[in-house]
Amino acid sequence: MENDMEEKFEDWKGKEAIPGKHGGIRAASIVCVVVMMENIVFIANGFNFVKYFMGSMHYTPATAANMVTNFMGTSFLLTLFGGFIADSFVTHFTTFIVFCCIELMGLILLTFQAHNPKLLPEKDKTPSTLQSAILFTGLYAMAIGTGGLKASLPSHGGDQIDRRNPRLISRFFDWLYFSICSGCLLAVTVVLWIEEKKGWIWSFNISVGILATALCIFTVGLPFYRFKRPNGSPLKKIAIVIISAARNRNKSDLDEEMMRGLISIYKNNSHNKLKWIDKATLNKNISETEVEETRTFLGLLPIFGSTIVMSCCVAQLSTFSAQQGMLMNKKLFHSFEIPVPSLTAIPLIFMLLSIPLYEFFGKKISSGNNNRSSSFNLKRIGLGLALSSVSMAVSAIVEAKRKHEVVHNNFRISVLWLVFQYLMLSVSDMLTLGGMLEFFYREAPSNMKSISTALGWCSTALGFFLSTTLVEVTNAVTGRLGHQWLGGEDLNKTRLELFYVLLCVLNTLNLLNYIFWAKRY
């Protein structure tokens, strides 16, 4: 929405924000640093939890894997809750402070349990009720906190940028994603190396220190930030508009004068989208602004829905791709053996190098196009979806090659073969998630920035859950045909390559669906 450029911002004292003193690059840079630190904590613990659940809490591998997947998915899904709080009741700054404290308390609780042998199960025993209660309380306190942080930080950073400068907003979101990738890289290299040398418990210790430092850094920036005060629940307003439009669906059309008024006020928006919403203006208590905001938000949902399958493909990096790596030759030299999680570092390094190049060439490509917020980012997302289809095809070829060499030649191919799928999926994620964060922020109504940017993270969550469901459905269907594609514990006896082909087909169909909605937007 472009009609939000006249928004009023305040400083931390409640006075009108002063350009040059409040907001700007300095304030947005603080947000990028905090995003990097938050992502170090989230990713490092995502890798650490599997070892912790299996080694210290004595859960089975399958249970531990599901616990991690559920934690990751829930964390991303709760960004909608965090976004709702930020847009409806308090500022993005306050949302961050509250949810960061919640995550920090959950992390401290898990660290305390890890250091206290009495709160851990004895050898070869499962956790007691008390031990499980402490574990899940700390775990999902972290998930709640993560949801609030990931929802509030991009919007808070975007609010620091002058919206009359679309290029600067685009640059901010490019470097925001650079910060996310930097956090991932540090997590899978430095933190993982310390964990391998010093033990998994160090991951908790480091995470507490980093998150506490991030909280302090973010708070120190208070005098430099500018804030937009929320004015009630936007979701409630949307519900009222939809209900009113439904009740008035059989009434006469809006008169020509009112329609002209709508078009003149929102001439930058496509008034032909969701015209049935206009019926809501027959209710005198509903403003034309509320109708247009509802139309805008509902128009984002098909784009959001079209990215979930791609997120399902990305989820394979932490599931089957990791299992493939365990069965491959991990030695790079005679004595050096690369940990499978560290394979992620290779595409991350490439992405960190490619983001500045992407920003440069993207700016050249979009020069003279003032509508980068929609058409440019829609093309960026579409390219990411297309690349994920290619990555699944490559994954199928690599798995077929790996299994053929093991079964017929008793030879384990190098783990570096996985770099191709890691690389393409990571670049696909950069294009899609990075594009979604900017697209949803730029296009969202002014009072729904956090909820709308949370849609990008929510897509990732639903992708994780869809992956779990798809595996179960695939096994159920193929089991009836005689042999489960993904059944059993021996990956060499599965048909993982066919599952990758299935994902390739589904994602290609999803790409066609996305193109349909993107053209209509």
From Swiss-Prot:
InterPro entries according to UniProt: MFS_trans_sf, POT_fam
Localisation per UniProt entry: Membrane
Taxonomy, superkingdom: Eukaryota
Entry keyword set: Membrane, Transmembrane, Transmembrane helix, Transport
Topological type in the membrane: Multi-pass membrane protein
Entries under Pfam families matching the protein: PTR2
UniProt family annotation: Belongs to the major facilitator superfamily. Proton-dependent oligopeptide transporter (POT/PTR) (TC 2.A.17) family.
PANTHER family registered for this protein in UniProt: OLIGOPEPTIDE TRANSPORTER-RELATED
The protein, known as: Protein NRT1/ PTR FAMILY 4.2
Bilayer-crossing regions: 30-50, 65-85, 89-109, 133-153, 172-192, 204-224, 297-317, 338-358, 381-401, 413-433, 451-471, 498-518
MF GO annotations: transmembrane transporter activity
Purpose of the protein: Involved in abscisic acid transport.
Tissue: Expressed in siliques.
GO CC aspect terms: membrane
The keyword Lyase is assigned to this record: no
